[in-house]
Design a protein with these regions (language model features):
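Radical SAM enzyme [4Fe-4S]-AdoMet core and its adjacent flexible, acidic
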Residues: 5-20, 24-164, 168-171
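Acidic helix N-cap motif at the loop->helix transition within catalytic regions
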Residues: 2
Length: 172
């Protein structure tokens, strides 16, 4: 409801609802039953309100890279945006490191996503494909291809309303 309220005040806002896969996988990883359905309902309500820049955001981990591809296809079927991030320590994930242990699988799924994005007719999708190439690079233990602009160009607001430069940093 707070997201819808925000969109009423700022109808030109861009909103990505963080979903970690399809229903079962999302709810398992988030530890909350019905989370996927709530997120999808929120996106559909935003669309009904006339908000145009809406879509899914997924943080890819050891456990959900295959669902990333299904969620991407769903976003395309619904004509919504799709954003990705690589797994990192944050409020939501219960792990002490940022290591992806099944790199080949995760990187292979990212490569498939990149191929789908490159077949689109939108330069924005091509830019996202480049970003995802950078995520493969990051997962393989290499340096970032793009500089981090956390806190300068974006921020993260946790479920308690605390503002962070990004969802992977501890400092407020």
């Amino acid at each position: 409801e707070r997201v819808l309220e925000l969109a009423r005040k700022f109808p030109k806002i861009g909103i990505r609802i963080s979903i970690e896969g399809l229903s079962q996988k999302n709810d398992e990883l988030r530890g909350r039953a019905g989370g996927f359905d709530k997120g999808l309902r929120t996106l559909l309500s935003l669309r009904e309100m006339g908000v145009k820049d809406i879509g899914f955001g997924i943080t890819v981990s050891n456990n959900n890279s295959e669902d990333m591809l299904s969620l991407y296809r769903l976003s395309k079927a619904l004509n919504m945006e799709f954003a990705t991030a690589a797994f990192h320590n944050s409020y939501y994930f219960h792990k002490d490191d940022n290591v992806i242990t099944n790199r080949d699988t995760v990187c292979g799924n990212f490569a498939e996503l990149i191929n789908m994005q490159m077949r689109e007719k939108h330069p924005k999708s091509w830019a996202r494909a480049f970003f995802n190439m950078g995520l493969i690079n990051y997962i393989e233990g290499n340096r970032r291809m793009l500089p981090c602009e956390a806190g300068l160009m974006n921020c993260f607001i946790d479920p308690y309303g605390e503002v962070y430069p990004c969802n992977g940093l501890e400092a407020k």
